[in-house]
Amino acid sequence: MKSSFKSEYPFEKRKAESERISEKFQNRIPVICEKAEKSDIPEVDKRKYLVPADLTVGQFVYVIRKRIMLPPEKAIFIFVNDTLPPTASLMSQVYQEHKDKDGFLYVTYSGENTFGYQ
């Protein structure tokens, strides 16, 4: 999944920004969160997040759910490098395993209707 953030900003600018963020906020992780292309789920109002290192993937999913005002009958799935990270994983662990060369962690979210409602 190609990130629109990556296509909008050159590598050098992204790397410089992530380094600046990491120096200023050492216990935070720079995350770019974007909706999957073909998903029918709402678009999130912002895509750059600075999350606490001890936040779990499940807690991050909750933050995204709230920001897009997703109804309870809709599911949301978070992908990092096209894989579903375990809900109990710490964002710092996911970051160490999957961070991009530019220093950001790229997360894609998608949804599907779990109960068949329209």
Curated annotation (Swiss-Prot):
<feature type="propeptide" description="Removed in mature form">
    <location>
        <begin position="117"/>
        <end position="118"/>
    </location>
</feature>
<dbReference type="GO" id="GO:0031410">
    <property type="term" value="C:cytoplasmic vesicle"/>
</dbReference>
<dbReference type="GO" id="GO:0000421">
    <property type="term" value="C:autophagosome membrane"/>
</dbReference>
<keyword id="KW-0833">Ubl conjugation pathway</keyword>
<dbReference type="GO" id="GO:0006888">
    <property type="term" value="P:endoplasmic reticulum to Golgi vesicle-mediated transport"/>
</dbReference>
<keyword id="KW-0472">Membrane</keyword>
<feature type="site" description="Cleavage; by ATG4">
    <location>
        <begin position="116"/>
        <end position="117"/>
    </location>
</feature>
<dbReference type="GO" id="GO:0120095">
    <property type="term" value="C:vacuole-isolation membrane contact site"/>
</dbReference>
<dbReference type="Pfam" id="PF02991">
    <property type="entry name" value="ATG8"/>
</dbReference>
<dbReference type="GO" id="GO:0034727">
    <property type="term" value="P:piecemeal microautophagy of the nucleus"/>
</dbReference>
<dbReference type="GO" id="GO:0071211">
    <property type="term" value="P:protein targeting to vacuole involved in autophagy"/>
</dbReference>
<dbReference type="InterPro" id="IPR004241">
    <property type="entry name" value="Atg8-like"/>
</dbReference>
<dbReference type="GO" id="GO:0140042">
    <property type="term" value="P:lipid droplet formation"/>
</dbReference>
<dbReference type="GO" id="GO:0034497">
    <property type="term" value="P:protein localization to phagophore assembly site"/>
</dbReference>
<dbReference type="GO" id="GO:0061025">
    <property type="term" value="P:membrane fusion"/>
</dbReference>
<dbReference type="GO" id="GO:0005829">
    <property type="term" value="C:cytosol"/>
</dbReference>
<dbReference type="GO" id="GO:0000329">
    <property type="term" value="C:fungal-type vacuole membrane"/>
</dbReference>
<protein>
    <recommendedName>
        <fullName>Autophagy-related protein 8</fullName>
    </recommendedName>
</protein>
<keyword id="KW-0072">Autophagy</keyword>
<dbReference type="GO" id="GO:0032258">
    <property type="term" value="P:cytoplasm to vacuole targeting by the Cvt pathway"/>
</dbReference>
<keyword id="KW-0968">Cytoplasmic vesicle</keyword>
<dbReference type="GO" id="GO:0031966">
    <property type="term" value="C:mitochondrial membrane"/>
</dbReference>
<dbReference type="GO" id="GO:0000422">
    <property type="term" value="P:autophagy of mitochondrion"/>
</dbReference>
<dbReference type="GO" id="GO:0031386">
    <property type="term" value="F:protein tag activity"/>
</dbReference>
<dbReference type="GO" id="GO:0031503">
    <property type="term" value="P:protein-containing complex localization"/>
</dbReference>
<keyword id="KW-0449">Lipoprotein</keyword>
<dbReference type="GO" id="GO:0061709">
    <property type="term" value="P:reticulophagy"/>
</dbReference>
<dbReference type="GO" id="GO:0005811">
    <property type="term" value="C:lipid droplet"/>
</dbReference>
<keyword id="KW-0653">Protein transport</keyword>
<comment type="similarity">
    <text>Belongs to the ATG8 family.</text>
</comment>
<dbReference type="GO" id="GO:0000407">
    <property type="term" value="C:phagophore assembly site"/>
</dbReference>
<dbReference type="GO" id="GO:1905153">
    <property type="term" value="P:regulation of membrane invagination"/>
</dbReference>
<dbReference type="GO" id="GO:0008429">
    <property type="term" value="F:phosphatidylethanolamine binding"/>
</dbReference>
<dbReference type="InterPro" id="IPR029071">
    <property type="entry name" value="Ubiquitin-like_domsf"/>
</dbReference>
<dbReference type="GO" id="GO:0016241">
    <property type="term" value="P:regulation of macroautophagy"/>
</dbReference>
<comment type="function">
    <text>Ubiquitin-like modifier involved in autophagosome formation. With ATG4, mediates the delivery of the autophagosomes to the vacuole via the microtubule cytoskeleton. Required for selective autophagic degradation of the nucleus (nucleophagy) as well as for mitophagy which contributes to regulate mitochondrial quantity and quality by eliminating the mitochondria to a basal level to fulfill cellular energy requirements and preventing excess ROS production. Participates also in membrane fusion events that take place in the early secretory pathway.</text>
</comment>
<keyword id="KW-0926">Vacuole</keyword>
<feature type="lipid moiety-binding region" description="Phosphatidylethanolamine amidated glycine">
    <location>
        <position position="116"/>
    </location>
</feature>
<keyword id="KW-0813">Transport</keyword>
